[in-house]
Amino acid sequence: MKLWGGRFSKATDGLVDDFHSSISFDQRLAEQDITGSIAHATMLGEQGIIPQEDADKIVEGLRGILADVKAGKVHWMVDAEDIHMNVEALLTERIGEAGKRLHTGRSRNDQVALDCRMYAKLACKETQEMLRELLSVLLDIAQDNLHTIMPGYTHLQKAQPITLAHHMMAYFQMFRRDLDRFAHAYDAADVMPLGSGALAGTTYPLNRERVAELLGFSRISMNSLDGVSDRDFLLEYLSAASICMMHLSRFCEELILWNTNEFRFVEMDDAFATGSSIMPQKKNPDVAELIRGKTGRVYGDLMGLLTTMKGLPLAYNKDMQADKEAFFDARDTLVKGLTVFTAMLRTVTFRKDVMEKGASGGFTNATDCADYLVKRGVPFRDAHAVVGRLVAHCLNENKALLDLSLDELKQFHPAFEADVFDDLSMLSCVEKRRIPGAPAPDMVQAAIDEGRKSLEENA
């Protein structure tokens, strides 16, 4: 008989058992479920709600089960439905009647909310550690490439010269924001819901603050209906995971492009590439492509849970069983993606000579040419028009701006002088941009130093 079967006259249909059971995936919450039960039983004993002797037996029994779970010695039962009923049934089997007192003052509704919050906190911390590692790699690459000039792009067309360091620090800022988002997701999960009961609290004198203290929560939930029905904390994790995967995907897209023969900016390490079953010459950036592809999967997890939650009346509904599969899948996908991406990025070879050569094409110094005129008194819109005509002339003559003679330049505007050639070099174009956030090496160095300090202070 089910632990809840007293009201029923017959057993559930086998099809229902199979459809209803969640142990196939919520067994992942075993450690959280047992740890939460240990805290609950400890409090029940301290409050005199159950005999202290029984509380001690329960705690000892649960610790034994936890040890067996970690050792892989426990086999879960599908007909026990979920991790909560499995643990309780196993406990009662091991310690007898005392085990039946564990669920005093508790419902599976607040129990599963507790388990999910504990796991979400763990997942947030884990993800933050992985992001810190990736951020450190980005800082190292940036530090080594302060003077590696490359083209910056808009609309996937060469726009202005920047440095590889500046480009890497753009991704540093993205992943740094991800770090903050997971900190917010952690805070959202850091609420202890036990004591909410099924939906209306309990008549027992539970010490909820004591349970929160034992489990490392900063605060307790303040409404029992919300305590059992809130899944915002999972949505916040999924949202942060989706944005983080989007950043990984953008980075992967650039590496895929840069790895092509058309760009040749990078060489992917053999250990992070694959071949073709028919074309012997191929070396494919499959790792980056797969991360890009799996991003949609995490988006789907977020949208799936949002859709599940959007029509649910208060308080708990069985629909919410679906939250865990979406959460676990997103967590696993993100963790694998961050792990392999960071390892791959460490091995990427940046072809500095190709990047620097690429920066000199596409009139990337045209804006600096206009700025040259502006600094000599020409209104910006007039300077813009002059340089536009210069570019058109160069295209017709198959020349770059620096290929023109001073006499040719003066035909377009008399403000051009001999110093224009130094002013339009790729190095000069980068070094002149000396405001915070710009690509001049000393500005990027300041950003790197600030980034390292931030990582150290928030480790």
Q: Language-model segments: what does each one mean?
A:
Residues 1-201, 206-213, 274-275, 286, ...:
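A helix-coil-helix interface module used to build multimeric assemblies
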Residues 1-36, 97-98, 279-459:
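Glycine-rich cofactor/substrate-binding loops
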Residues 23, 80-82, 92-93, 236, ...:
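A short linear-motif detector with a strong N-terminal bias
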Residues 37, 84, 88, 234-237, ...:
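Short runs of predominantly hydrophobic/aromatic residues within well-ordered alpha helices
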Residues 45, 62-73, 91, 95-99, ...:
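Structural signal for hydrophobic packing residues in well-ordered secondary-structure cores
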Residues 49-50, 74, 263-264, 379, ...:
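Conserved hydrophobic residue
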Residues 117-124, 128, 143, 151, ...:
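Charged, flexible cofactor/metal-binding loops and thiol motifs
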